[in-house]
Amino acid sequence: METQEPKDSSPPTEQRILSEELISEGKWVKFEKTTYMDPTGKTRTWETVKLTTRKGKSADAVSVIPVLQRTLHHECIVLVKQFRPPMGGYCLEFPAGLIEDGESPEAAALRELEEETGYKGDIAECSPAVCMDPGLSNCTTHVVTVTINGDDAGNVRPKPKPGDGEFVEVISLPKNDLLTRLDALGAEDRLTVDARVYAYALALKHANAKPFEVPFLKF
């Protein structure tokens, strides 16, 4: 990124944005050159990608963690596999999508879950807005955990309702063996596991692992 030495050697109290210049804009995203001040007083530039759809919403999107619960079955995490042109291959992801105008994060999560998987669920919890790839864009999402009653008649044979141009395969994996299953699937050619899914699986593994023992100090 470009830098410019400050005229005043006194460092600013905090880093801040000085200007944002639009370089290119499409239907869904725009590309900007962001000029900002660093802690030493230098002016720097950053190449930034932004969505065009936020318009005052609490976040751009929702990412859904769907927990499928059925009698006499292990809990499963419902994922979606779809082709992602920027990756040039398939990705295994949580159901997700943009929040529509006037829509709450919870409503968006339930809508996206039903559209992409066919399942209907209940909200367990909703996170505050969290960033997705802050080194590249300002995109934010709510992470929404949804429980699915797999014994409900409407969830026995769910039928996805994909939008135009959406081609999604639903994959349910056991929660207690999620990381192992992801590693096996990730070894397939042209399939990449989304970082949010993998981080969730790692967290499950660490949470269920033997607690770390405090080492004895040697004097």
Curated annotation (Swiss-Prot):
Record has RNA-binding as a keyword: yes
Main location: nucleus
Subunit relationships: Homodimer. Interacts with PARG.
Segments forming domain Nudix hydrolase: 57-197
Residues recorded as bearing Phosphothreonine in the entry: 45
GO CC annotations on file: nucleus
Positions bearing N6-acetyllysine: 210, 218
Protein name: ADP-sugar pyrophosphatase
Cofactors (names): Mg(2+)
Residues modified as N-acetylmethionine: 1
Catalytic reaction(s) noted: D-ribose 5-phosphate + ATP + H(+) = ADP-D-ribose + diphosphate; ADP-D-ribose + H2O = D-ribose 5-phosphate + AMP + 2 H(+); 8-oxo-dGDP + H2O = 8-oxo-dGMP + phosphate + H(+)
Binding positions (Mg(2+) 2): 112
Source superkingdom: Eukaryota
Protein's organism: Rattus norvegicus (Rat)
Compartments, record wording: Nucleus
Ligand binding (Mg(2+) 1): 96, 116
Entry annotated with the keyword Transmembrane: no
Signal sequence segment: none
UniProt keyword terms in alphabetical order: Acetylation, Hydrolase, Isopeptide bond, Magnesium, Metal-binding, Nucleus, Phosphoprotein, RNA-binding, Transferase, Ubl conjugation
Residues in cross-link Glycyl lysine isopeptide (Lys-Gly) (interchain with G-Cter in SUMO2): 42
EC number(s) from the headed UniProt entry: 3.6.1.13, 3.6.1.58, 2.7.7.96
One annotated GO molecular function: identical protein binding
Gene Ontology BP annotations: ATP generation from poly-ADP-D-ribose; chromatin remodeling; D-ribose catabolic process; nucleobase-containing compound metabolic process; nucleoside phosphate metabolic process; ribonucleoside diphosphate catabolic process; ribose phosphate metabolic process
CDD domains listed in its UniProt record: NUDIX_ADPRase_Nudt5
